[in-house]
A protein has these predicted regions:
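Eukaryotic scaffold repeat domains enriched in small/polar residues
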Residues: 1-320
Length: 320
């Protein structure tokens, strides 16, 4: 019997064992997922084949990026099926064709900016595009910053600093934009999503979240958002209920519409998550969830030996 998550208009069926890899291949952590105009699913992962492409039924199509990336972290795909891949291991953002040709590199591979200097980049995390194809980059692990670049990769401006006040960040982990040009930043360890105009002016924030990690905007005049939330990261609250890991669906004002999973902690059973890190949605409304399961295992299950293979990619099919 299929497992159904969510409620009301936001119900999803768990598609078990989605994504058929060639023999001997593995994802390791799936840091990010993207879907192009043909509903091809790009899986940006930390295995030997960094970009693996499937059709929406999970059939393997191709791979690329071998020898290019150091540590996969973020992926965004534009309307022309151009990919923006964020590598926090070598402090770069690469713009690539759907076949894997690198067209632009922002940042100097292997040369981070000084820690918390505010200069790009020190372990950048994700990208998003403005309606004018300007490139926003969340720079969240070694900085507390959002950078705005021209389509050619020239720095226009930056904003943010370490802290918990509006406009400050404690791990700017993910970033998204909508068709009106608003910028949404998953401020992970401040447990919120902050909303800015296209030039970094603070507008509002969404709370009622727990360590928001993945962030996806379902575009349109009244967009909804899917937010991947990590579970507790400390031994004292590790087994506390209702804190994730989970997905939350909210409207453009941050009002909660549905929650998927997360009531009784992490797990490998259908309907549970380990560490939802990257999100994408196809033309049918199905959700693809990339999880950093290997990285998270010891946090979630400190007393359980790590399995050799751990699920790190899920598909949730929307229920009509």
């Amino acid at each position: 019997m299929s497992v159904i998550l969510g409620s009301g208009e936001h119900r999803y069926r768990v598609v078990e064992n989605w994504g058929k890899l060639p023999d001997g291949w593995s994802f390791k952590d799936v840091a990010a997922v993207g879907v192009d105009s043909k509903d091809q699913v790009y899986v940006f992962n930390r295995g030997e084949h960094p970009v693996i492409v499937f059709d929406r039924d999970g059939n393997f199509l191709r791979s690329w990026g071998e020898g290019v990336f150091q540590r996969a972290h973020g992926l965004d795909i534009d309307k022309n099926d151009v990919l923006y891949l964020t590598d926090d291991g070598d402090h770069t953002v690469r713009r690539c064709t759907s076949a894997g040709k690198v067209e632009l590199t922002i940042g100097i591979p292997g040369k981070p900016a000084p820690f918390m200097s505010g200069e790009p980049f020190h372990r950048c995390t994700h990208t998003a595009l403005s309606p004018k194809d300007e490139i926003y980059v969340s720079d969240g692990y070694g900085n507390a910053r959002v950078h705005k670049f021209s389509p050619a990769g020239k720095l226009i401006m930056s904003w943010g600093e370490s802290g918990s006040e509006p406009g400050q960040f404690n791990i700017a982990h993910n970033i998204a934009t909508d068709d009106a040009g608003w910028v949404y930043v998953a401020d992970r360890e401040n447990h919120r999503v902050q909303v800015f105009d296209g030039n970094g002016k603070y507008e509002t924030q969404w709370n009622n979240l727990h360590r928001p990690c993945g962030l996806y905007c379902c575009r349109g005049k009244s967009p909804t958002f899917v937010i991947g939330e990590l579970g507790p990261g400390m031994p004292v609250n590790l087994k506390a209920p209702n804190l994730g890991p989970r997905l939350s669906i909210v409207d453009a004002q941050g009002k909660l519409l549905a929650r998927l999973g997360g009531k009784d902690g992490p797990g490998l059973e259908p309907g549970k998550f380990l560490a939802p890190h990257g999100l994408a949605i196809d033309s049918k409304g199905d959700i693809y969830v990339g999880e950093v399961s290997y990285t998270n295992w010891k946090t979630s299950f400190p007393d359980t030996p790590q399995p050799k293979t751990i699920r790190s990619l899920q598909k949730l099919a929307r229920v009509p």
